[in-house]
């Protein structure tokens, strides 16, 4: 009779541990589910960090992207970009020689996504702006950008 109680206790304990593991795994899965149809997007732009003190960029605060910060060769903050990709400003094309590089919040991957392939607003990356084939703003991406390639090429 004691063996039967011990087996029941062990079985109960295994079930509780299994449920705990299942719940913890489910909490870490991205709950965003996107449909599989392809979007009809023309291109995407993702503001990225560019330049360095040794390799400066040619830009000015007006044409710099909102959300990106611009710095001098010495690392001194110059400005935040003023141009909104959804509604671009008419800016002069001159280079601000005080600006050497930018730091943007999303800095993985390419700045220009063309062609977009089967990207939709749902599968597009947060912080990236997607435009139709006519060049008009469609949406901002909704999915988190992968941090690293989990399956490197063999």
From Swiss-Prot:
GO terms for molecular function: serine-type endopeptidase inhibitor activity. It comes from the Eukaryota. SUPFAM superfamilies: Plant proteinase inhibitors. Disulfide bonds join 34-122, 38-118, 46-128, 58-95, 61-79, 62-91, 68-104, 121-139. Residues 1-31 form the signal peptide. Sequence repeats lie at residues 31-87, 88-147. The record marks 93-94 as: Reactive bond for chymotrypsin. The record marks 36-37 as: Reactive bond for trypsin. Pfam families: Prot_inhib_II (PF02428). Keywords: Disulfide bond, Protease inhibitor, Repeat, Serine protease inhibitor, Signal. Belongs to the protease inhibitor I20 (potato type II proteinase inhibitor) family. This is Proteinase inhibitor type-2 CM7. It comes from Solanum tuberosum.
